[in-house]
């Protein structure tokens, strides 16, 4: 272990990564697997079969209350009113001057309840921004970082593999559902991802992450680290905060005008 890593946060799957021989590196305050067998074979596995990523370092913010939709409409760039009750939507969080604080996915969990997934490096900043702008809205904002582990199962065979473990039907693209998965209850399954492949992302209680990870890898899902996650997203031109987006660069300049709905009156 490199000097100083004892201060880094660890995901619930850390011991499994170490046992699998993963190369662990500091990333956004976490000790994360950058690769297992190697970036190239992991990249190919996702493009041709199925890979599984531990993305539990990503943050979660829950927003609820009578004004939850109106509040998110104010701070997020996309049209939050268009998110179906089981839907998901990509957007950006902007400063007053239009600089990008983060790019995010928001899931509608109910008529007045939403879950927004933040980038790991921006979670505390995003949470503070949410709370700062909640004044005047009948809304509650809660940090859910430690309430969820998050796995991404991606590739042409991803849905078929997850379906073997699921008690119920998987959601379509940009939709969500809650299922029991490999005996793990109340898993939020979202038809989203960061690879350009079909697949799902799983948000579940941290104590069940190991059970689901084991069930997936035992059935052929290849563990994939952050290295291949980056090459996969780069290959399909998905944005990376800190490279393509920053507080000094607006969403229009970054090519994200499609998710900025000016008629909603969002900040930025």
Regions found by a protein language model. Give the residues of each.
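Short hydrophobic/aromatic-rich motifs at helix boundaries and adjacent loops
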Residues: 41-45, 99-102, 131-134, 184-187
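Well-ordered mid-protein domain cores that form the structural environment of catalytic cofactors
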Residues: 79-133
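Conserved, structured C-terminal
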Residues: 1-34, 109-267
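N-terminal glycine-rich flavin-associated loop
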Residues: 55-66, 107-115, 153
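Acidic, proline/glycine-enriched N-terminal capping motif
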Residues: 1-94, 99-101, 227
């Amino acid at each position: 272990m490199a000097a100083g890593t004892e201060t880094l946060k660890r995901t619930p799957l850390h011991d499994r990564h170490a046992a699998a021989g993963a190369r662990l590196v500091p990333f956004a305050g976490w000790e994360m697997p950058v690769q297992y067998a190697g970036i190239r074979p992991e990249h190919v596995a996702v493009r041709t079969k199925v890979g599984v990523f531990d993305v539990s370092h990503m943050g979660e913010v829950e927003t609820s209350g009578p004004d939850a939709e109106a509040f998110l409409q104010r701070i997020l760039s996309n049209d939050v009113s268009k998110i179906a009750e089981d839907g998901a939507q990509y957007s950006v969080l902007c400063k007053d001057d239009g600089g990008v604080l983060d790019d995010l996915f928001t899931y509608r969990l109910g008529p007045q309840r939403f879950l927004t997934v933040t980038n790991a490096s921006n979670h505390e900043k995003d949470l503070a921004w949410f709370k700062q702008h909640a004044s005047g809205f009948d809304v509650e904002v809660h940090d859910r970082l430690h309430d969820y582990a998050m796995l991404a199962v991606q590739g042409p065979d991803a849905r078929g593999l997850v379906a073997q473990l699921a008690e119920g039907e998987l959601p379509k693209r940009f939709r969500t559902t809650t299922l029991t998965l490999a005996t793990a209850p109340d898993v939020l399954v979202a038809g989203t991802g960061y690879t350009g492949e079909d697949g799902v992302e799983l948000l579940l209680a941290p104590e069940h992450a190991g059970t689901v990870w084991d069930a997936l890898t035992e059935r052929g899902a290849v563990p994939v680290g952050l290295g291949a996650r980056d090459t996969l997203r780069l290959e399909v031109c998905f944005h990376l905060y800190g490279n393509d987006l920053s507080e000094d660069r607006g969403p229009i300049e970054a090519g994200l005008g499609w998710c900025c709905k000016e008629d909603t009156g969002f900040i930025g």
